[in-house]
Amino acid sequence: MSAHISASLFGAALALTATAAGSQDMARPKPIVIANDNGGRLQTYYERYEAYVAAGATFRIDGRCRSACTLVLLWADRVCVTERAALGFHQLRDKSGQRAQSESDHLMSLYPAPVREYISAHGGLPPPWGTMWVSGRALRGLVKPCE
């Protein structure tokens, strides 16, 4: 079979698939479940979440999500939390382990307003070696609850 015919058949198959998919009630893809995640490198988490979002993913926080894991809130419109959710926040640190205040302030400015306000009302971000935990019950007033 020539490449031209193969390409034509492939194109026709895609068109038929798209038409069939459009006429059916397609189920929503399952959300990515976040639980028992202690975080890691900010850049790694940011790139991972950005790729998931580009693919149309949504997120369900159903357990602990600490440190860099909380970057998922930058896409709060795609996030829901259960009563089992707990988010752990802290200030960022530089390569020497010292507080990175300006970077922490910048990250705080990116979180949704209700989350920023809650953290500020409860003493602000703790130092990098501490953690402020926000429970599922409190989170459900700050981030969309899961259905």
How would you label these PLM feature ranges?
Residues 1-9:
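Bacterial N-terminal signal peptides that target proteins for export
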Residues 21-23:
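Signal peptide processing junction and immediate N-terminal pro/mature segment
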Residues 25-26, 147:
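Compositionally biased, proline/threonine/alanine/serine-rich low-complexity intrinsically disordered stretches
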Residues 26-93:
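Cleft-lining beta-strand/loop regions that shape enzyme active-site pockets
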Residues 31-34, 43, 47-58, 97-147:
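Charged, glycine-interspersed solvent-exposed loop segments at helix/strand-loop junctions
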